[in-house]
Amino acid sequence: MSYPQDGHGFFTRALDAEDRGRLDEAETAYQQAIVLFEEEGDAEQEQAACHYNLGHLYLGMNRPGRAVTAYERALQLFRRSSGSGRHQARTHLILGSLLLEMERHREAEEHLLDALGQYLDAPHEPVDQAQCHVNLGRVYEQGARASQAVTAYNRALDFYQEAEDTAAEQAECFTALGRLHEAAGRMLESGSAYAAAARLRRAAGRPPLDEDPAEELAQDEERPADREPPGGADAARGTGLVEGEDRP
């Protein structure tokens, strides 16, 4: 296939190479697109899209350090573009999730809190907001900040209960709450939370588990399909009010 020899052409070449699993070729094409967009000027959104996609690419290549650098550069460029609040929120969420998995907890917390700030200004999918609170809960739990962790998991439940097909995710939150209440000696609340988790797991068709870490959002992130990366909300599951469990 013939591609134009400009930034958009190399961007398309990178997308096609990535779709075919030719990751090294995709990396080179994204980098060439970035150089050409920089030369064109006034193409910060396009540059941001390249760095954003490179972040996803590096995750697939198991190069998390480079993924962090790419997402951070994308975030810098999104900040210069008007109307990019959704993209900023999504990138903060990805970075927070990735840094949490890398055990860089302070940086993870900063990005997750920044994502929450963006959600106040830019409408976003409940599932993304829930995942942000889940990861904050994990940060707080690992930092022995139990009361903040309880609050974060409860906030995650608020958002998950606004979305369809989130029984498994709600179960994870209740499992975490059960664990936290148990550690604090609140056995009644702990038992109620574990029971809620078991009911939700059955509803989701999953067997009860002792402990399951929250899913790693950064690893599940889908690459944007066009030159302007959509806030991951565009690909998220549809929303709709569902009945949730009562909280202990």
Ranges and model annotations:
Residues 1, 39-42, 80-84, 121-125, ...:
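Short coil/turn linkers that connect adjacent helices within long alpha-helical scaffolds
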Residues 3-35:
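Alpha-helical segment of the N-proximal tetratricopeptide repeat
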Residues 8-21, 45-60, 86-101, 127-142, ...:
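Conserved alpha-helical positions within TPR/SEL1-like repeat arrays
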Residues 34-36, 75-80, 114-121, 157-162, ...:
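Amphipathic alpha-helical segments of tetratricopeptide repeats
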Residues 35-49:
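Short, charge-rich amphipathic alpha-helical segments embedded
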Residues 151-154, 158, 187-205:
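TPR/TPR-like (Sel1-like) alpha-helical repeat modules
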